[in-house]
Amino acid sequence: MVSLNPFLEQSIIMNRNNETTETFSKLWVTAMITLTMMLPVNVACSQTKQQVPQQSIKTIYPTKDWAISDFVVTAPEFGAKAEPGFDNRVAFQAAIDAAYQSGGGVVYIPAGNYEFRSTQVGTKNVRVRQGRSETKKDFHFEYVLRLHPGVQLRGDWADPASHNGKVLGTILEVRVGKDSPNYDGSVESWWNDGQADNALRTTYTSIADRFIEMNAGTGVTNLSIWYPEQDIHHVKPYPWTLFQTQGDCATIERVTLVNSYNGFNSAPSELHYVLNSYMTALNKGIEVHVCTDIGRIENVRISPEYWANSGLPGAPSLEDVTAYTRANGTGYQMHRSDWEYVSYLYISGYKTGVWIGREPGFADAPNAQLYEVHVGGCGNGLYVEDVNPYGILISNSSFGAGQDGNAVYFYKDFSTSVQFNGVDFKGSVVGDGDGGVVSFESCTFSEYNDYALRMNRGNVLLSQCEFKKNAGHVYLGANMHTLKSVNSGYKSKLKVDNHSTSAKVEVITGKKYFFEPIPKNVKTNIDVHPRPVSDRVLKADLARATGFNNDRPVKDVSADLQSALDAVKAAGGGTLYLPAGRYLVNNPIKVPSGVELRGSWDVQHHTQSGGTAIFTNYDGGNAGESGPSLIQLEAHAGIRGITLAQLNIASDGFSVENPRKTPFLIQGQGPKVYIINVTIAVGDKGIDLASYDTSGHYVDYLGGVPLRAGIWVGGGAEGGFIRNMQLNPHYGSRLPEGGQGYPEVFMMRFVQSNCSALKFADVKNQTIFNNFVYGSVYGIHFLKDAITGKYPGEMTVIGHGSDGCTYSLFVEDADKDTKIVAINSELVNTKIPNEPVRSYVLMGDKVNTDKVHPDAKLILYNSAFWGSPVIGAIINNGIVSFQQANFSRSGTQGVDVRGGKAHVYTSYFAQKIAETTVKDEGYARLGAQGKSIEFTNNYYISGFRFNKSGEGLIYGSDKK
């Protein structure tokens, strides 16, 4: 319970740089603040103890949030020392173990240099392949630190970009592992692919040594890692610095890897997230293997400069480091990853900047979307060994070669799809692939030697691309199949050196084919990360369930929690911190303005890793699903690092087929509310940002399985951000150790037929970035605002993924001013029972609907469509433009214009159509009331096949 006992206190508050900023009187309240190791019991009540509220941990360097931790490695019970010669392995592991036993939390490392001089031994049990049989065998590896689920390491980090490259603050010195024979070890093994009906695969399982082993639901943030004994003139291999083993969610944020040999390895697992980090890696920076749910790389810089400019003893010259990495290193290496999201990745000075290809041992390759990826000064800026049929989307990026290098190289195994939109190439693009389509839209080519494009095989599309030289544009090798170009070249004149034996070459120019190019410089993140103005923290000791058991909390703490929140508000704002455990909140609470409700998580997380959770049976009472939300955020209030679970969603007369209807779990009630690193283990509805004007709202990494509604936005909000939403039914069925009282529900079928994941109504200047939903009727949905009566305005959607949906993108309502621009969309349908019609895009709910204005616009730049559509895209009204798309599967009709208009440019229709087809089957259909379809500069694997039943017009460069 929270003890309300106000008193007057004179304080001198220090800012994060330890400068005195103000002296003031404050009215504060006291609360029980105790540190209790998590025991396998249900904490049914709490004692009352008056104690002075605390400030957050004082850091030397700026932080995006306030630093909060119950476990400080230098505390006497752990004994870490920032002293030369002291081995910190035991002390750090003790703090990590304590945090784990307490249910999870942050282990804090104050600024200083901490040495590590010894290892521990781990065991990996592997299904070893022996011919066509298998056996289970243990392999040993060495590691220094093991992060258990729910535990995060956090230090005090100085951004090198703000300190002339200097590495300052918390530095982990690795003085063990030099010249390890098992620095990157693996063993041939068997593996069942859960994404392919458990098909048996041959692969290689890593048994490599590692410095920090990251298990499910772990994080490494705000620190630097340095190898003092590495010598650029005598480079020795070291084990992986950071190694994600398996399971969901490993996060690396605000980390500098000064001179790793190998940086971060994501072994077969899911949901890695590397962001806002820097590294010099001498061999490999980031390597990804068999990631079967969205991995994210965001704002990461990989370059020789971070070691050279570190200011640390023995730092070599930039020239010496670059000479080594340019001869030996790979910045980012992606093997099979399903839907990897890569944005704002910067790589320079490597042999290979970005490598994309197969898993060792079998042919599975990735699909991915890359946005604002910039590679320069590399032997191969981008090396493409192979890609799965769904393709790679690359937008608003640049690839540059060093001397005698290639901006892009396609290896002989490539035979699918890579799409470049708004990409600048400095150096040659060379293609030795075996087929497929490489397409370029609104791209530039410069600084090449003989030819900008040297394509020896396959098919190439060029649309509105600029070549900076008046010669040497395209070389076609003997086995080239197709080159199609519209309005491309030097001043729109394309020069082709054709050495093919039978290539189809089509070069067209004309003003009638001009189109609006992909938008540039789109803002995707907020300028200042939200947090309370005050750094004061009240740690509430409320009744909760704890331990690795299946206990649920029994006491409703709603009133105590509200009292604590109000107390923080009364004292001028700050953070109410709930340590790890399961809390029962059966009545609505309101987070006051200027207050943050915070749990044990500094990073994104999955249900399976425990931590702080709010359990509830609240269902809206007499008002039902129209009742108040469980957690209500006033203006400038937030919630961070917590999991929510609706306990009674499928009980007491309800089931997974008919789950309980409840209000939204979270509702924003004013401007600048924020929801960060929140997970919904299961709930009926997620976040309501539509009932009030929540201008400036910020949602980053909502994960989970809401059943009927994910995030709904409207109410006239302006300047909001919805980022990194990750909705997948497995959040409801993958439980933490011991179950920990979470309901185990398998909701795939229900959400596919009932959920509307993302809704946008009356919003302006909305940022919608790198979101993903698996299973929904409508993956992303645009409609008229139920409160203001207004329509969606102009907005840009970047990196949206809808998988397993009935309609992956649905525009239900739009007026003449509606303009929705989508970049790097991946839209997928799957066969869903009782859903007879499925399509990637639905514009309007019926033919010539008056809910969609004829001038309303939907423009999709650089898209990938696959799965099991009945019809690829259904246009009932308005104008839909496909500016580069891979229709891996197009259904009966790829683009079905029943009303309104469509434009299709630079697209690949990869589904083969037999010479004798069913009625109406084709890549396009213009219905009796459809106005027009333009087809310009596309590739059709079975030739241009279309159907027309009215007076509308089919035109474009492909219509002969």
What are these regions (language model features)?
Residues 75, 258-260, 581:
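Transmembrane beta-strand segments that form the barrel wall of outer-membrane beta-barrel proteins
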Residues 110, 117, 148, 154-156, ...:
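Feature marks extracellular polysaccharide-active and adherence modules
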Residues 239, 659-662:
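Asp-box/WD-like beta-propeller blade repeats and closely related beta-sheet repeat scaffolds
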Residues 118-119, 163-166, 176, 229-236, ...:
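Short glycine/acidic-rich loop motifs that flank beta-strands on beta-rich extracellular proteins
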Residues 218, 247, 292, 338, ...:
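Small-residue (G/S/T/A) turn/hinge positions that recur once per unit in extracellular repeat modules
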Residues 3-18, 25-233, 253, 298-300, ...:
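Extracellular "leader-to-stem" segments immediately downstream of a signal peptide or signal-anchor
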